[in-house]
């Protein structure tokens, strides 16, 4: 296992920051088509930073999906997803993370059918050069839990999962059971803390000062033979600036205890 972080500043300053933090890689997350096109256009400069710093791009992802509407996969949007996937391959990433939005105009069956077509298109384009992983984040993505995985993943044996325990915890699901049952399909893991008080979520502090049972998380990862990367996700409005930088170092020290 290696430890890195999400870093959407992929200029020389962003790469230098990650290197100075003592981390091994960056993950780039694109939250819309504009951000995806920006990365596609910057692929040569990003590759130059990889060579300069020795910090690689472990994963590229697309969040907040708009890939289907009116019962069909949008071909123009699909091209951007495929170009982003090609960029991830060009940069040497290990995984490409995506999801698919739910189309309210069609049936659940048709949504599942379109999801299978969509992920199969990505898998075919990858052609074994990179792992395709579905995110368990709910942000304009409906393929996020065992209910959907049980339908889609058996149809696509090469489709993996990008797992974040905090997402399951925040929807009151059993993240340890999900990891135990589906651990062999996990290709990439987000390290993000989350804290609840009573029935309300409070914040997403650094992992290690949160509610997630990270010891059990790692016990399950080891039991399922996980050898993928661990990506710190800063995700708190409170932990910003100097406090945010200190939080990254806190998480790094905490998580490294489990990396045997």
Regions found by a protein language model. Give the residues of each.
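N-terminal small/glycine-rich loop or linker at the start of catalytic domains
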Residues: 1-2, 58-68
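Active-site-proximal loop/turn and secondary-structure-junction residues that shape catalytic pockets
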Residues: 9-11, 30-32, 63-66, 100-104, ...
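Glycine-rich, proline-tolerant flexible connector loops at the mouths of alpha/beta enzymes
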Residues: 27-50, 100-107
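The substrate-binding groove and active-site-proximal loops of carbohydrate-active enzymes
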Residues: 32, 65-74, 208
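Active-site acidic/histidine proton-transfer and metal-coordination neighborhood
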Residues: 49-52, 69-160
């Amino acid at each position: 296992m290696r430890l890195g972080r999400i870093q959407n500043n992929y200029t020389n300053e962003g790469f230098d920051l990650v290197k100075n933090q003592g981390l091994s890689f960056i993950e780039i997350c694109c939250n819309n088509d504009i951000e995806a096109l920006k990365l596609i256009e910057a692929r040569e400069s990003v590759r130059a930073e990889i060579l300069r710093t020795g910090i690689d791009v472990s994963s590229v992802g697309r969040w907040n999906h708009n890939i289907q509407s009116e019962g069909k996969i949008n071909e123009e949007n699909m091209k951007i997803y495929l170009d982003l996937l090609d960029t991830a391959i060009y940069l040497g990433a290990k995984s490409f993370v995506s999801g698919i939005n739910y189309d309210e105009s069609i049936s659940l069956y048709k949504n599942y059918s379109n999801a299978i077509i969509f992920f199969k298109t990505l898998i075919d384009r990858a052609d074994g050069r990179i792992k395709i992983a579905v995110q368990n984040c709910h942000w304009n993505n409906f393929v996020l839990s065992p209910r959907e995985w049980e339908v889609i993943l058996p149809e696509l044996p090469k489709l993996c999962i990008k797992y974040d325990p905090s997402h399951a915890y925040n929807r009151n699901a059993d993240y340890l059971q999900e990891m135990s049952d589906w651990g062999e399909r996990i290709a990439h893991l987000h390290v993000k803390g989350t804290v609840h008080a009573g029935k309300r979520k409070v914040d997403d502090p650094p992992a290690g000062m949160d509610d997630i049972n990270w010891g059990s998380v790692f016990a399950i990862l080891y039991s399922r033979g996980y050898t993928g990367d661990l990506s710190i996700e800063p995700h708190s409005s409170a932990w910003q600036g100097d406090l945010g930088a200190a939080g990254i170092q806190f998480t790094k020290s905490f998580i490294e205890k489990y990396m045997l």
